[in-house]
């Protein structure tokens, strides 16, 4: 199963981008052995519309252009379901085992995600009750994807 991260906003050069890239590189090296291949990061620009609803709609349209037919869409949103790392890994393992070819994890802009994306989503997850800057969310999801691969492969990176 190919895994992609779609994000509203561009991650500028710096330590956040470097750390996210480090976890993505680890994921890309270890995932294929268990059927999880990192595909790509798609970044779309933030809308400049004057109101939040229009911005969310425009950003969703930009993200949807890159969404393959039949892709499983997982949204990251503060109102989503909280999972621990083993449950997160299990979700992806189950999707892989069910024959899904493409998985997209979407990170919204400052205003969140448009309802059109919620209608297409298989799951909506949160990264806890705290509010995180988008740069940190990118690091957190990259690390959790790598952690999920290590859990599914029995690697000792994740310890309970």
Swiss-Prot record:
PANTHER family: METHYLTRANSFERASE, RIBOSOMAL RNA LARGE SUBUNIT METHYLTRANSFERASE H. It comes from the Bacteria. Its main location: cytoplasm. GO terms for cellular component: cytoplasm. Homodimer. Keywords: Cytoplasm, Methyltransferase, rRNA processing, S-adenosyl-L-methionine, Transferase. It catalyses: pseudouridine(1915) in 23S rRNA + S-adenosyl-L-methionine = N(3)-methylpseudouridine(1915) in 23S rRNA + S-adenosyl-L-homocysteine + H(+). CDD domains: RlmH-like (cd18081). S-adenosyl-L-methionine binds at residues 76, 108, 127-132. GO terms for molecular function: rRNA (pseudouridine-N3-)-methyltransferase activity. This is Ribosomal RNA large subunit methyltransferase H. NCBIfam families: PRK00103.2-3. It holds the Pfam family SPOUT_MTase. It is an enzyme of class 2 (transferase). Its EC number is 2.1.1.177. It comes from Agrobacterium fabrum (strain C58 / ATCC 33970) (Agrobacterium tumefaciens (strain C58)). Specifically methylates the pseudouridine at position 1915 (m3Psi1915) in 23S rRNA. Belongs to the RNA methyltransferase RlmH family. It is found in: Cytoplasm.
């Amino acid at each position: 199963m190919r895994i992609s991260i779609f994000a509203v906003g561009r991650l500028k050069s710096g330590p956040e981008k470097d750390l996210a890239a480090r976890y993505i590189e680890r994921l890309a090296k270890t995932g294929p052995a268990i059927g999880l291949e990192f595909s790509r990061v798609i970044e779309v620009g933030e809308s400049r519309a004057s109101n939040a609803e229009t911005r969310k709609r425009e950003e969703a349209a930009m993200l949807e252009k890159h969404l393959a037919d039949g892709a499983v869409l997982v949204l990251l949103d503060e109102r989503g379901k909280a999972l621990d790392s083993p449950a997160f890994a299990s979700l992806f393992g189950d999707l892989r085992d069910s024959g899904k070819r493409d998985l997209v994890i979407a990170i919204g802009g400052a205003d969140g995600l448009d309802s059109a994306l919620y209608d297409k989503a298989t799951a909506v997850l949160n990264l806890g009750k705290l509010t995180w800057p988008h740069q940190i969310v990118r690091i957190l999801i990259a690390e959790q994807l790598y952690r999920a691969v290590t859990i599914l492969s029995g690697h000792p990176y994740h310890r309970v």
